[in-house]
């Protein structure tokens, strides 16, 4: 039977390129669980910028810590030119508060979150982040120029990072409602930020026949298909007479009872005319990939009737290959990391031991004894 996973050693090694960086080597009795966690302990006094207009000390400010810890790493004369903003999420060791754990290799935010008892030793926080006062955008015109990429020459990085952060979401929501086909709006959508997908879901629920809605459906499937299904449902519910909607919202009719299989495989609006997947719900899109289309033609040059009977034979199954759609993909489901547990193994060991004990008792040979006759007078 296996033994429990135990921590045998912890070694702290200093970095070579940067003395602030350190490596915590965790050694277990099973080598496959060994990990090296890189972290930083800030010790510099900043009088320079880590990037244009920004200073980001290697310090994780966890709950309960004063923000004065962040300003303690900047020289007073230099600090007057900067202001502290909401930094990126980070993790820190509770027994060494302020340390900044690097996310790399197997060590990710999801890995730390899913670790059993991780919150007993690791705390979440915000990294110290300063921006030069001259880089703060104090008016809507400056935000518009940066987020719409009209003029990004003097834009801070948080407003000029290809929409990777939330800083342009408010502006882009209003901007893209007025111009949803704008290339910058489609770039914002391709990042798959929730505000962008929600905005286009609302837009396409009124204008699903627009070209940009085809791109919208392509981007959100398969992981965020509900945004597209909602838009299609609302649009087709408001436009029941639109033939493009007849696959998703087919008019009530008894003709469907004459065919076998889902209508997405045989209905004219689902196959021949409506090749754009935006007119299908996601489950219909998946279903259509399982439909096999066979095209057959019969050319008659002359026709001779005998006894009023005519036979037409189509040789479609010999030379014609079936054609189907490409599968749109499956949504990604992230499973939680399962750490090894020995509770089940321990219970099994106890049960087996008890069984063997009773077997050994009852399998021993009987001890011979003399019969004793007892008679009562």
UniProtKB/Swiss-Prot annotation:
Family under the similarity heading: Belongs to the orthopoxvirus OPG143 family.
Transmembrane segments: 342-362
Record has Nucleotide-binding as a keyword: yes
One record GO biological process: membrane fusion involved in viral entry into host cell
Summary of subunit composition and partner proteins: Part of a stable entry-fusion complex (EFC) which is at least composed of proteins OPG143, OPG147, OPG155, OPG086, OPG094, OPG107, OPG104, and OPG099. Formation of the viral membrane is necessary for the assembly of the complex. Interacts with OPG094. Interacts with OPG153.
Underlying gene: OPG143
Induction: Expressed in the late phase of the viral replicative cycle.
Post-translational changes noted in the entry: Most cysteines are linked by disulfide bonds. They are created by the viral disulfide bond formation pathway, a poxvirus-specific redox pathway that operates on the cytoplasmic side of the MV membranes.
Positions of N-myristoyl glycine lipidation: 2
GO CC terms in record: membrane; viral envelope; virion membrane
Coiled coil: none
Molecular function via GO: ATP binding; DNA binding; helicase activity; hydrolase activity
Localization terms from the record: Virion membrane
Record-given protein name: Virion membrane protein OPG143
Keywords per UniProt: ATP-binding, Disulfide bond, DNA-binding, Fusion of virus membrane with host membrane, Helicase, Hydrolase, Late protein, Lipoprotein, Membrane, Myristate, Nucleotide-binding, Phosphoprotein, Signal-anchor, Transcription, Transcription regulation, Transcription termination, Transmembrane, Transmembrane helix, Viral envelope protein, Viral penetration into host cytoplasm, Virion, Virus entry into host cell
Membrane topology: Single-pass type II membrane protein
């Amino acid at each position: 039977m296996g033994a429990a996973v135990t921590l045998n050693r912890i070694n702290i090694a200093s970095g070579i390129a940067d003395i602030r960086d350190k490596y915590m080597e965790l050694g277990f009795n099973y080598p496959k669980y060994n990990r090296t966690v890189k972290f930083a302990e800030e010790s510099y006094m900043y009088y320079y910028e880590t990037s244009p207009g920004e200073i980001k000390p290697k310090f994780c400010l966890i709950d309960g810590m004063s923000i004065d810890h962040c300003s303690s790493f900047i020289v007073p004369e230099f600090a007057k030119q900067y202001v502290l903003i909401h930094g990126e999420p980070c993790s820190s060791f509770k027994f060494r508060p302020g340390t900044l754990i690097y996310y790399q290799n197997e060590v990710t935010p999801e890995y730390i979150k899913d670790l059993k008892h991780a919150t007993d030793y690791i705390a979440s926080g915000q990294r110290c982040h300063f921006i030069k006062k001259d880089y703060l955008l104090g008016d809507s015109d400056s935000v518009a120029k940066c987020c719409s990429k009209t003029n990004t020459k003097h834009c801070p990085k948080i407003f000029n990072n290809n929409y990777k952060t939330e800083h342009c979401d408010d502006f882009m929501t209003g901007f893209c409602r007025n111009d949803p086909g704008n290339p910058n709006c489609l770039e914002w959508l391709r990042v798959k930020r929730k505000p962008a997908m929600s905005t286009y879901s609302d837009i396409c629920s009124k204008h699903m026949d627009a070209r940009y809605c085809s791109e919208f459906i392509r981007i959100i499937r398969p992981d965020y298909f509900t945004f597209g299904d909602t838009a299609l449902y609302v649009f087709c519910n408001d436009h029941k007479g639109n033939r493009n909607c007849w696959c998703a919202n087919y008019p009530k009719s008894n003709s469907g009872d004459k065919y076998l299989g889902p209508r997405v495989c045989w209905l004219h609006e689902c196959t021949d005319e409506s090749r754009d997947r935006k007119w299908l719900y996601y489950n219909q899109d998946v279903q259509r990939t399982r439909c096999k289309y066979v095209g057959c033609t019969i050319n008659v040059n002359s026709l001779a009737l005998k006894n009023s009977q005519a036979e037409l034979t189509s040789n479609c199954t010999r030379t014609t290959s079936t054609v189907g759609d490409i599968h749109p993909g499956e949504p990604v489901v992230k499973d939680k990391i399962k750490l090894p547990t020995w509770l089940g193994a321990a219970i099994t060991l106890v049960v087996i031991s008890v069984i063997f004990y009773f077997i050994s008792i009852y399998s021993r040979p009987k001890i011979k004894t003399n019969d004793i006759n007892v008679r009562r007078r």
